[in-house]
């Protein structure tokens, strides 16, 4: 359940995929008023983290989805004064995620940029690393 979820990011094409799933998004630089119950910080940049604390309501939650490539200095005065809950999120528990996928409770197809055969895994990893695709799915055949 989510009252007011907002995902902050820096890539318009990635945020558009979330918009298609009816998820509210904002670019790091977009002017938005404070008030989100939950802000998912997915930029991996210090400016995105600071922006997340500006967007979340007092006593709201900031979910840190990505890590920064470099150590980040963090002014804790805003989250302390506003009693903001900070949650780290990496992969999460796999069993509930797999159950939700198998039951069709989560629509992931719009997030998959392409599907390739396992024999083309090396090229798929290179494509995924390029930053030009969201997710690449490897297909493992029974034969």
Predicted regions and their residues:
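Phosphate-bearing ligand-interacting subdomains
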Residues: 41, 45-47, 121
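Glycine-rich phosphate-binding loop and adjacent beta-alpha segment
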Residues: 2, 46-105, 140-143
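Mid-domain Rossmann-like dinucleotide-binding core that forms the NAD(H)/NADP(H) cofactor-binding site
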Residues: 1-30
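Hydrophobic/aromatic beta-strand patches that form the interior of the parallel beta-sheet core
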Residues: 6-8, 26, 40, 63, ...
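A short acidic, Gly/Pro-enriched loop at the edge of an enzyme's catalytic core
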Residues: 31-39
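Short conserved AdoMet
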Residues: 44, 57-58, 129, 133
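C-terminal hydrophobic helical "lid"/dimerization subdomain
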Residues: 12, 50, 95-143
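Short, acidic/turn-prone active-site loops that include or flank metal/cofactor-
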Residues: 11-13, 28-32, 67-70, 91-92
